[in-house]
Amino acid sequence: LFPILCSFGRYTVPVPVAQTIVARALLGSQFAMPNGMITLGAALRREADGAIVCSFTPYGRVADFVLAQDGDALLLLPCAAAQREASGVHGSLAANLRWPDERIATHVPGAGPLLPTFAAALHAALLSGAMTRVFEMTLKHCNDRIQFGKTLGKFQAVQHQLSVMAEHVAAASIAAEAAFRTDTTTPSLLAAAMAKSRTSEAAVLVASIAHALHGAIGIAEEYDLQLLTRRLHEWRIAHGSEAHWNALIGNSVLASDASIADFVRSV
C-alpha cells in the first residue's frame, strides 16, 4: 500500500482516493459502503445549537462524505447536506464543513481511536511521494539551468543545498515507509506518529530550498513545483503538524522505563 499512497502524493491527485481507501478500511466489511469519495475529518466539534463542524477538512470541497472521529466511534457525514466554506492556501481543496442537524450522520461504533493513526500514516506517505518529486524536479533544474557560464549544479553552495534536501527527503521516506511495516492491518500509533512528525518537519525545509533554487519560475502557474509545495504545506498540518506528534512521542518516551535506544528499537 505504501508505494500506491506515495504515488498519489507524487502526482498530486486532486481527489481523495487515498483517503477513501483508508476510510473503507476503517469502516470494515460489516458496514454498507456508500457510493462516492470519502475524506477524513481532521477535527469534529459540536456547537450549542446541535450542529456538527469539521474544520479544515482535506478535500472537503470535492468529497462526497466525511468520516470523522467522535470519541470511540466514527461518524459518516454526507457533504451534500453540509454548508461548505473553502479554507487553506490558494487553490486548496480543503474546506470547513457544517451540518446543521446531527441526525443525518451515520454512527459507526468502535473504530474512532484508529482514525488519527491511519490519517498520520496516510499523510506521511503522501508527503514522502510529493517531496521525492520536488527533489527530482529541483535536481533536474539545477543540472539544466545555466547561470554565469555554467549549470547551477556546479556551484558549491547549490550542491550543499541539494545535499541537505536529499538528506531530509531520504530520512522522511524511511520514516514514512516504516509506518507501513507491520504484520497487522493497523499501523502502530508510535510508528505513524514518528512518520508524520518526520515528514512534516522535512516538508517545510524541502519546499523552501526548492523555491530558493528554482527562483521565480517555481511559483509560475505553468510549472508544477507550486502544485507540490502548496500541498506539502497543507499536508504538513493536516491531522497534526510535527509539534502535535512530537508531544505524543515525547510523552510515550517519558512513560517508558526503557532507554531511548531501546525505545526506538521497540517501535
Regions found by a protein language model. Name each.
Residues 1-11, 115-267:
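Alpha-helical interface subdomain recognition
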